[in-house]
Protein backbone atom coordinates (compact mmCIF):
# COMPACT_ATOMS: atom_id res chain seq x y z
CA UNK A 1 0.00 0.00 0.00
CA UNK A 2 1.36 3.40 -0.96
CA UNK A 3 0.50 6.71 0.59
CA UNK A 4 -0.61 9.35 -1.83
CA UNK A 5 0.57 12.84 -1.12
CA UNK A 6 -1.96 15.50 -2.00
CA UNK A 7 -0.58 18.82 -3.11
CA UNK A 8 -2.53 21.93 -2.26
CA UNK A 9 -3.02 24.35 -5.08
CA UNK A 10 -4.59 27.79 -5.26
CA UNK A 11 -7.74 26.27 -6.73
CA UNK A 12 -7.98 23.55 -4.08
CA UNK A 13 -11.62 24.25 -3.31
CA UNK A 14 -12.66 23.86 -6.93
CA UNK A 15 -10.72 20.61 -7.40
CA UNK A 16 -12.23 19.03 -4.30
CA UNK A 17 -15.75 19.92 -5.37
CA UNK A 18 -15.10 18.71 -8.91
CA UNK A 19 -13.75 15.35 -7.74
CA UNK A 20 -16.86 14.69 -5.66
CA UNK A 21 -15.11 14.28 -2.30
CA UNK A 22 -17.12 17.06 -0.70
CA UNK A 23 -20.80 17.65 -1.19
CA UNK A 24 -22.07 21.16 -0.80
CA UNK A 25 -25.56 21.24 0.59
CA UNK A 26 -27.61 24.29 -0.13
CA UNK A 27 -29.69 25.57 2.76
CA UNK A 28 -33.29 24.45 2.53
CA UNK A 29 -36.09 26.96 2.77
CA UNK A 30 -38.68 26.91 5.55
CA UNK A 31 -41.27 25.40 3.22
CA UNK A 32 -38.90 22.61 2.16
CA UNK A 33 -38.30 21.69 5.80
CA UNK A 34 -42.04 21.46 6.44
CA UNK A 35 -42.21 18.45 4.09
CA UNK A 36 -40.39 16.25 6.65
CA UNK A 37 -42.51 17.26 9.65
CA UNK A 38 -44.49 14.61 11.58
CA UNK A 39 -48.28 14.57 11.77
CA UNK A 40 -48.32 15.36 15.50
CA UNK A 41 -46.17 18.49 15.13
CA UNK A 42 -48.86 21.00 16.01
CA UNK A 43 -48.84 23.91 16.75
CA UNK A 44 -46.11 24.65 14.22
CA UNK A 45 -44.27 27.94 14.67
CA UNK A 46 -44.44 30.17 11.62
CA UNK A 47 -41.33 31.36 9.84
CA UNK A 48 -41.02 34.59 11.85
CA UNK A 49 -41.81 32.93 15.17
CA UNK A 50 -39.28 30.17 14.47
CA UNK A 51 -36.60 32.82 13.83
CA UNK A 52 -37.49 34.51 17.12
CA UNK A 53 -37.25 31.16 18.90
CA UNK A 54 -33.82 30.52 17.41
CA UNK A 55 -32.67 33.99 18.46
CA UNK A 56 -33.95 33.35 21.99
CA UNK A 57 -32.07 30.04 22.11
CA UNK A 58 -28.85 31.79 21.01
CA UNK A 59 -29.20 34.33 23.80
CA UNK A 60 -30.11 31.70 26.39
CA UNK A 61 -27.11 29.57 25.40
CA UNK A 62 -24.80 32.15 26.97
CA UNK A 63 -26.27 31.21 30.36
CA UNK A 64 -25.84 27.45 30.73
CA UNK A 65 -28.45 26.88 33.44
CA UNK A 66 -31.20 28.74 31.57
CA UNK A 67 -31.31 26.41 28.56
CA UNK A 68 -32.10 22.72 28.89
CA UNK A 69 -31.66 20.60 25.79
CA UNK A 70 -32.25 17.01 24.92
CA UNK A 71 -35.23 14.78 25.52
CA UNK A 72 -34.09 13.29 28.83
CA UNK A 73 -33.04 16.59 30.39
CA UNK A 74 -36.24 18.39 29.34
CA UNK A 75 -38.40 15.52 30.65
CA UNK A 76 -36.59 15.58 33.98
CA UNK A 77 -36.84 19.34 34.37
CA UNK A 78 -40.53 19.40 33.48
CA UNK A 79 -41.20 16.64 36.00
CA UNK A 80 -39.30 18.56 38.69
CA UNK A 81 -41.39 21.67 38.05
CA UNK A 82 -39.15 24.01 36.04
CA UNK A 83 -41.06 26.54 33.98
CA UNK A 84 -40.24 28.30 30.75
CA UNK A 85 -40.85 27.84 27.05
CA UNK A 86 -40.60 24.45 25.33
CA UNK A 87 -39.49 24.22 21.72
CA UNK A 88 -39.73 20.86 19.99
CA UNK A 89 -38.37 19.65 16.66
CA UNK A 90 -41.01 18.56 14.19
CA UNK A 91 -38.93 16.10 12.16
CA UNK A 92 -38.28 13.52 14.89
CA UNK A 93 -38.41 9.81 14.10
CA UNK A 94 -39.71 7.69 15.75
CA UNK A 95 -42.43 9.97 17.04
CA UNK A 96 -43.12 7.75 20.06
CA UNK A 97 -40.05 8.97 21.92
CA UNK A 98 -41.47 12.45 22.45
CA UNK A 99 -45.20 12.35 21.72
CA UNK A 100 -46.03 12.61 25.44
CA UNK A 101 -44.18 15.90 26.04
CA UNK A 102 -46.85 18.27 24.63
CA UNK A 103 -49.39 16.75 27.04
CA UNK A 104 -47.00 17.29 29.94
CA UNK A 105 -46.52 20.92 28.88
CA UNK A 106 -50.28 21.46 28.69
CA UNK A 107 -50.71 19.94 32.16
CA UNK A 108 -48.06 22.23 33.63
CA UNK A 109 -49.25 25.31 31.72
CA UNK A 110 -46.01 25.72 29.76
CA UNK A 111 -46.31 27.23 26.26
CA UNK A 112 -44.75 25.12 23.52
CA UNK A 113 -44.38 24.99 19.76
CA UNK A 114 -42.73 22.90 17.09
CA UNK A 115 -40.08 24.09 14.65
CA UNK A 116 -39.52 22.27 11.35
CA UNK A 117 -35.96 21.03 11.87
CA UNK A 118 -33.98 19.59 14.76
CA UNK A 119 -30.77 20.53 12.94
CA UNK A 120 -31.83 24.19 13.11
CA UNK A 121 -32.43 23.89 16.86
CA UNK A 122 -28.93 22.49 17.27
CA UNK A 123 -27.45 25.21 15.08
CA UNK A 124 -29.19 27.87 17.18
CA UNK A 125 -27.48 26.38 20.23
CA UNK A 126 -24.16 26.58 18.45
CA UNK A 127 -23.55 22.83 18.11
CA UNK A 128 -23.38 20.65 15.02
CA UNK A 129 -25.71 17.99 16.39
CA UNK A 130 -29.46 18.52 16.29
CA UNK A 131 -31.70 18.38 19.34
CA UNK A 132 -35.24 17.13 19.82
CA UNK A 133 -36.45 19.36 22.67
CA UNK A 134 -35.43 22.58 24.39
CA UNK A 135 -36.61 24.24 27.58
CA UNK A 136 -35.74 27.93 27.81
CA UNK A 137 -36.01 29.57 31.23
CA UNK A 138 -36.48 33.29 31.81
CA UNK A 139 -33.49 35.54 32.46
CA UNK A 140 -33.23 39.31 32.90
CA UNK A 141 -30.75 39.65 30.03
CA UNK A 142 -33.23 38.52 27.36
CA UNK A 143 -36.50 39.21 29.20
CA UNK A 144 -38.09 41.31 26.41
CA UNK A 145 -37.55 38.67 23.72
CA UNK A 146 -38.61 35.91 26.11
CA UNK A 147 -41.89 37.68 26.95
CA UNK A 148 -42.59 38.38 23.27
CA UNK A 149 -42.02 34.74 22.26
CA UNK A 150 -44.03 33.45 25.23
CA UNK A 151 -46.95 35.70 24.30
CA UNK A 152 -46.91 34.51 20.68
CA UNK A 153 -46.64 30.85 21.71
CA UNK A 154 -49.58 31.24 24.08
CA UNK A 155 -51.63 32.71 21.22
CA UNK A 156 -51.06 29.67 18.98
CA UNK A 157 -54.00 27.31 18.66
CA UNK A 158 -53.34 24.10 20.54
CA UNK A 159 -54.99 21.11 18.82
CA UNK A 160 -57.51 19.09 20.78
From Swiss-Prot:
One Pfam family linked to the record: Ribosomal_L7Ae
PANTHER family: RIBOSOMAL PROTEIN L7AE FAMILY MEMBER (PTHR23105)
Entry superkingdom: Eukaryota
Record flagged with keyword Signal: no
Main location: nucleus
BP GO annotations: germarium-derived cystoblast division; rRNA pseudouridine synthesis
Protein name stated in the entry: H/ACA ribonucleoprotein complex subunit 2-like protein
Subunit: Component of the small nucleolar ribonucleoprotein particle containing H/ACA-type snoRNAs (H/ACA snoRNPs).
Keywords: Nucleus, Ribonucleoprotein, Ribosome biogenesis, RNA-binding, rRNA processing
